[in-house]
Amino acid sequence: MTDKTFLVEIGTEELPPKALRSLAESFAANLTAELDAAGLAHGEVSWFAAPRRLALKVANLSAAQPDREVEKRGPAIQAAFDANGVATKAAEGWARGCGITVDQAERLSTDKGEWLMYRARVTGERTQVLLPAMIATSLAKLPIPKLMRWGASEVQFVRPVHTVTLLLGDELIPANILGIDSARIIRGHRFMGEPEFTIDHADQYPQILLERGKVQADYAARKAIIKADAEAAAAKIGGVADLSDSLLEEVTSLVEWPVVLTATFEEKFLAVPAEALVYTMKGDQKYFPVYDKAGKLLPNFIFVTNIESKDPQQIISGNEKVVRPRLADAEFFFNSDRKRRLEDNLPRLETVLFQKELGTLRAKTDRIQALAGWVAAQIGADVNHATRAGLLSKCDLMTNMVFEFTDTQGVMGMHYARHDGEAEDVAVALNEQYQPRFAGDELPSNPVACALAIADKMDTLAGIFGIGQHPKGDKDPFALRRAALGVLRIIVEKNLPLDLQTLTEEAVRLYGSKLSNAKAVDEVVDFMLGRFRTWYQEEGHSVDTLQAVLARRPTRPADFDARMKAVSHFRTLEQAASLAAANKRVSNILAKATEPLNDSVQASLLKENEEIKLATYVTALSSKLQPFFAEGRYQDALIELAQLREAVDNFFDKVMVNAEEKEVRINRLTLLAKLRELFLQVADISLLQ
């Protein structure tokens, strides 16, 4: 039997575009895991995905599992037979499980005794017998948040299924998957090519679908076509298309046969802030905006249609007619909003709840205003501008534009603030208060914006924890994890002199008596320190490095970061492993000590050369390193401490810590405590593995 190509295609109704790629990738990963678990040798597993299909193609799939030797050890001979040599129930039960009698079992002799043994050669199952269950399992494990049923069947999937094709080479594998019997039928494009046709061999896929069905099933190829054609179309009109990856992925998932076209809109709409126009084009219509070389929006857009038309101009005109009312709405909202000052929207915030136990957006605004001013004072930002930005921070939520185009919150506040003549750093802060919105997003660009962004996020963290609604499992309705990480990123990357403890205390204080959770401050600080775990692990730091720093609970993020970098560098030193082990030993010794230690090491009680030498080093370093610790020069401090390795090793080799003489014993324990205190000024090195 030779290796063959395997094909599975699931033909469906239109799949969710934002989930299409992840569904296909998960399908491929699941089937690969199934094949590997079954011991089926195979080549590359390729995935294909289009709006109405998911498909996998496995190269060089073996025709059967390899034969394998099975060994099962049974009871020991003394437990397998009674005094009369009759098989015990334990032996008979084991034999039944193996499909033999006790008399048919072999015996295994070792240095430790003799046991019953079953050996057999199991013939591998044929691949076509195994595949249907593997496909069913792979589909059942797909990350589908909401399943649906169709017709009278109880079968559930992300969308109704119409065709299933399982081919191993040219052989159709009989199976019923998701309520559909496997067949050779493949469905083509809805309006072009052949509506359906038969496929004879797995190797024909996806080319036969491209040629006869007018469907480009290769997701990567389809995406590349759209990208190349859109770039060419933009260049033709002297522009550059905004091919942001998320929209490009979504558009790729919406079409089977991509055709790129260019359209225009009236230049008068360019008077509206570009963000509102782009929101409409990208969010509502799935169009690609076009910019000139200077980054200014052009009165053009590029879109992708799913059909080759004999009259493409008709399709272009249709899309222009669709987008025009949306742009006209944006123009109307922009003009009407500017008839009143941004600040005039402040009273209307009283009508909107932030959270039922925490009050209105107006109350939140007052807290943000106060906290932004407090933060600004700590970081050296303009306090007046920060409090002004805090006062205006949520006013744009009451504008017509943001009500209709919700994703323009913040940016419209900036435009309206500029129109009202507010200071530029105040206007920019209104736009940047929500940054960073996601991993890798830009941070606020000026100190006032940093103060406002921190204040907004900390107010939410303090309030939600203050009423006991912290995130649980995957549920995080107020995006507190993102808020915490955002605050940490701003403080660390901008090197701001803020302490999480005092920052949280101030945020909680501004709520007055509204908060019922007396532990809110500690819980928020611990939660935020916990977010460092995700951050530093993504940067490649080991878990034990993080635990070593967390053990000291440093609450100033910039200080936390300096400690992390110091410990990570320390681990690269040749002395690190020995000193980490020594710290662990010291920690264990001190944990078992029951006698109170001295405030300082008594030189007169030092008897051995090794303890005298170690005490001399520890005393000298205690004095030398204090400026290092005070200035946060933790890396330099650990480099100095690394020089203690030889003295520490010699101490443990030559000195009996638990001496019989009480005063000597306590003095030696005190010396070890002083040694450990030096390292603990940076991190708990004993936790390093």
From Swiss-Prot:
GO terms for molecular function: arginine-tRNA ligase activity; ATP binding; glycine-tRNA ligase activity. Disulfide bonds: none annotated. Transmembrane segments: none annotated. InterPro entries: DALR_anticod-bd, Gly-tRNA-synth_bsu, Gly-tRNA-synth_heterodimer. GO terms for biological process: arginyl-tRNA aminoacylation; glycyl-tRNA aminoacylation. It comes from the Bacteria. Its EC number is 6.1.1.14. It is found in: Cytoplasm. It is an enzyme of class 6 (ligase). GO terms for cellular component: cytosol. Its main location: cytoplasm. Keywords: Aminoacyl-tRNA synthetase, ATP-binding, Cytoplasm, Ligase, Nucleotide-binding, Protein biosynthesis. Pfam families: DALR_1 (PF05746), tRNA_synt_2f (PF02092). It catalyses: tRNA(Gly) + glycine + ATP = glycyl-tRNA(Gly) + AMP + diphosphate. Tetramer of two alpha and two beta subunits. Belongs to the class-II aminoacyl-tRNA synthetase family. HAMAP family: Gly_tRNA_synth_beta. This is Glycine--tRNA ligase beta subunit. It comes from Erwinia tasmaniensis (strain DSM 17950 / CFBP 7177 / CIP 109463 / NCPPB 4357 / Et1/99).
